[in-house]
Every structure is written in structure tokens, then in C-alpha cells.
């Protein structure tokens, strides 16, 4: 790391904070939507997919804005502030409208578009200096290792906040109870389940003793459960404040494309033609990469949707006799990346 340009660690730490906040949200988003609105995995998946589609589309918009303004650092700061506003909207427990939640997700997606790609562009420009050109690949591996450090701990933070709030309200966590509470309140629960499993679980999670009124219990547990989810989104705000402080304190270490462009000499006609041929070759290579990464991200982003639902519904949530939650499985992939990156480089 000591041989890398000075701005790399600063940029990596700023990205670590933002990714910590983002993956805190992604660890719980699907389960939050299902619990908050009483919807099934299919409906939650549509919102999840729409959100992720928006992230990738708005990343292009964020790049166009930064290119037009030639102010990458200002665009990055704006992205952090916009994302903070989106997470703040999700943090409010009184939000009951699905439209408001989707709107907040779109705000986060737009802020992400302003932030993520432009920060990575600045990291790439650190290696335009011939002194560091040979270290580019290693530098990006270090940069992405820092991203995964944030992603690795994020699910634990989300689960910790939710379960802490449940305890303050006199309840323990149970992955099945949210759906059962919705069934009881909606009148779709059979008498056998109401008098059997639902009553048994209610007694298990109630720290104050067996509930006298199951209707009151169902509403109280849902309120506490969903409020815990809302407060978990506040972790993202704290992480973004960290990112903002780190970025502002170190932004002079990062390149300024506007200054670099002003210092360039006017290229000759031959140089322009040569650059055009090189750009065309790079575009061909880029489209080849597109053909691969589309399927990679198609699979990867099942983490927050189908794999989370599979973990909750079809996995024994216990390790060495200790209970775990479905969200924790999302730490497995970044953990492997953090452990293996030093081996690779």
C-alpha cells in the first residue's frame, strides 16, 4: 500500500463508509418491504429490481453530469448529500406509504449515481501518472477490498439495530412472526395456527410474559419490528457522514480533471486519428466486458432477494447452536473477498 498514490486510501475509506451504509440497507430491504407492507417476495422483488435498475441507469446520468460540469469532486459531495436525504426518509417510522418508500429509494439511486462511478473515475486518474501506472491493477484490488470491508460488517449493523429496538419494546426477534402477525390482523389465519404456532411464538418472544390479547400483540410486534428496520437505515446516515468527512479532508489528494484538461496541449491531427483508433479498440473491448458482467451482476444481486428469501424460508438459521438471521448470509461473499484479496495481490 505504501507504494500507491496518496489519494487511494482516502478514496477507499470514503467508499467504505458509503458502501457500509448501502449494504446495511440492502441486507434488510427485501425483508423490510415484506414486513412493512405485508407483501410477498414476488411483490418485494419487483420493487427491489426497479431500485437496482434505477441505480445502474442513474450511474450513467451521474457520469454525464460530472463530465458536463467537469466538477467530479463537487458531484461526489452532492451524491453523498442526496443519498443522506434518501436514507433519512426511510428512517422515519411514521412512513406508511409504499410510494414514499419507493421515492426515497429513487433518491438514494440518484445519489448513488452521482457518487459511485465518479469516485472510481478519480481513482483511475490517480494512475494516469506514469509513476503509478504499473500499480493500477493492485490499486483497484485494494480499493475493492475496502468496499467489501464495509459490506462485510453492514448486515450485522442492520440486524443489531433492529433486534436492539425489539428488545427495548419487550420483544425478541423471530423471522416467522412478521408474516404471521399480518395474517392475524388481516383475518387470513386459520384457528389452528392462531391457537397453536402463533400463540406459542408470541409467548416465546414476549419478554413481559404470555400476551393476554393476541390482536394487541400482533400490532405491537409489527410496529416494533418495522420501527427497528426504519432505525437500521439510520446506520447508513452515520456511515455517509464518515464518508463525507474523509472525502472533504482528503480531496486535495485526488486529481482534478478540470485542471488536468486545462494543462494539456492541443493534439495534432495525427494524434487525434491515433486516439480515435485507440478509443474504438477500447470500446470493442468494453462491449465484450459488458457481455460478461451483465450475467455476473444478474447472479450477484440475487444476494438481497432470492438468496435472502431462501435463507429465511429454507435454511436452518443456527451455527454451532447459536441462532443467526437470514441477513447475515450477505456477509459471506465480502468476507471471502477481504480474506482472499491480500493473497491474490
Task: Describe the predicted segments one by one.
Residues 46-68, 116, 152-154, 331-344:
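Central cavity-lining transmembrane alpha-helices of secondary-active solute carriers
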Residues 16, 86, 98-118, 290:
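Hydrophobic core of transmembrane alpha-helices in multi-pass small-molecule transporters
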Residues 27, 60-61, 149-164:
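A gly/Pro-rich, aromatic-decorated transmembrane alpha-helix motif that marks the paired
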Residues 68-80, 134, 345:
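Cytoplasmic membrane-interface "Motif A"-like loop-to-helix N-cap segments
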Residues 39-53, 135-141, 228, 307, ...:
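Loop-to-transmembrane helix entry
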Residues 78-99, 345:
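C-terminal ends and interior cores of transmembrane alpha-helices
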Residues 1-6, 129-133, 137, 159-322, ...:
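Intracellular loop-helix junctions on the cytosolic face of multi-pass helical membrane proteins
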Residues 2-52, 288-291, 297-313:
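Helix-loop boundary and gating motifs at the non-cytosolic
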Amino acid at each position: 500500500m505504501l507504494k500507491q498514490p496518496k489519494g487511494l486510501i482516502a478514496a477507499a475509506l470514503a467508499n467504505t463508509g458509503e458502501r457500509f451504509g448501502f449494504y446495511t440497507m440492502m441486507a434488510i430491504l427485501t425483508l423490510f418491504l415484506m414486513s412493512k407492507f405485508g407483501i410477498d417476495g414476488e411483490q418485494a422483488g419487483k420493487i427491489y429490481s426497479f431500485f437496482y435498475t434505477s441505480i445502474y441507469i442513474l450511474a450513467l446520468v451521474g457520469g454525464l453530469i460530472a463530465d458536463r460540469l467537469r466538477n467530479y469532486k463537487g458531484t461526489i459531495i452532492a451524491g453523498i448529500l442526496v443519498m443522506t436525504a434518501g436514507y433519512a426518509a426511510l428512517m422515519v417510522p411514521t412512513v406508511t406509504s409504499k410510494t414514499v418508500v419507493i421515492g426515497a429509494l429513487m433518491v438514494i439511486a440518484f445519489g448513488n449515481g452521482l457518487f459511485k462511478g465518479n469516485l472510481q473515475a478519480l481513482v483511475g486518474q490517480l494512475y494516469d501518472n506514469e509513476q503509478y501506472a504499473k500499480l493500477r491493477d493492485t490499486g483497484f484490488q485494494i480499493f475493492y477490498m475496502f468496499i467489501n470491508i464495509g459490506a462485510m460488517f453492514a448486515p450485522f449493523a442492520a440486524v443489531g439495530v433492529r433486534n436492539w429496538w425489539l428488545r427495548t419494546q419487550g420483544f425478541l426477534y423471530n423471522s416467522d412472526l412478521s408474516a404471521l402477525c399480518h395474517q392475524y390482523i388481516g383475518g387470513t389465519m386459520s384457528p389452528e395456527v392462531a391457537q397453536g404456532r402463533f400463540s406459542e411464538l408470541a409467548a416465546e418472544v414476549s419478554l413481559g410474559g404470555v400476551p393476554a390479547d393476541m390482536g394487541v400483540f400482533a400490532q405491537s410486534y409489527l410496529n416494533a419490528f418495522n420501527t427497528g428496520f426504519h432505525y437500521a437505515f439510520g446506520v447508513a446516515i452515520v456511515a455517509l457522514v464518515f464518508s463525507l468527512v474523509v472525502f472533504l479532508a482528503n480531496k486535495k489528494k485526488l486529481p482534478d480533471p478540470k485542471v488536468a484538461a486545462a494543462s494539456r496541449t492541443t493534439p495534432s491531427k495525427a494524434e487525434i486519428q491515433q486516439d480515435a483508433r485507440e478509443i474504438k479498440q477500447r470500446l470493442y473491448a468494453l462491449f465484450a466486458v459488458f457481455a460478461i458482467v451483465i450475467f455476473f451482476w444478474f447472479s450477484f444481486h440475487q444476494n438481497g432477494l432470492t438468496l435472502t428469501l431462501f435463507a429465511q424460508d429454507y435454511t436452518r438459521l443456527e451455527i454451532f447452536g447459536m441462532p443467526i438471521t437470514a441477513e447475515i448470509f450477505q456477509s459471506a461473499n465480502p468476507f471471502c473477498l477481504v480474506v482472499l484479496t491480500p493473497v491474490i495481490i
